[in-house]
Amino acid sequence: MTKIYFVQFIILFCTVISSDKVNPLFMDSIESDNVKEVVKFLNQGVDVHAHEDYALKYSSFKCNLELVKVLISHGANIHSDRDLALHYAAQQGCFEVVKYLIKNGANVNARQNSALIRACDSHHYEMIKYLIDKGANIHAKNNFCLRNSVLHHKWEIFTYLMNNGADINADNGAALFIAASDNDISAIIMLNAYNADMCIDNCKALLSAAHLGNLDTVKYYTSHSICDTKNELKALTYAYNNNQYHVFDYLLSKSNINSKI
């Protein structure tokens, strides 16, 4: 769990335990994963919906499938706070909880497909496949999952996403731009193999590489004649203006550019 997620959840928890609407002993039993005590309180009529079904959210966050089942069987609202329980379960990698929540009606596309986004962020391949199979939008956040798989070299995920309709050129070729900016040749080769538009947005990827001094990327572009001479001349200018003289010298040595200067 990242620090930011942990801090957010602690703030929420502190808000809950200070609320007059929450039975503190019930919350203690939830926090300590004491299923027997939780059932006892529920049978005594404790409000399972207190603080927007916080008990279900907390149990989902903790990957406690048994408690999640108990709470839902006692009427917990699976859609509370825009299906936040599903978001937490996906965020924490709680695959079995995710499957149970969806089986019981959770909206897989709630919170702008946050469940899929969190699964992609943690590179949880099986969860990604499951969520997409259940209708999650593969194009969420301008194909975030595809960009993330390229950035982190998760090629199994990348291949699955491409085979299921992800847009390799989404967001003006953001995946390619990231790879070129990082001088990530293996990613560039993979994107080219899957027919990415290598010249998208006026060869932005090449110009970024020249600006940053990423010689390997510049060499890949020129050796494969990906961009026209006009854009290679632009790259030459970018390199010179940003003191990337190793890139400038390389581009200057290219006969097709030299003849145009």
From Swiss-Prot:
ANK repeats lie at residues 21-50, 51-80, 81-110, 112-140, 142-170, 171-203, 231-259. Pfam families: Ank_2 (PF12796). This is Putative ankyrin repeat protein L99. The keyword Ribonucleoprotein does not apply. The keyword Phosphoprotein does not apply. Keywords: ANK repeat, Repeat.
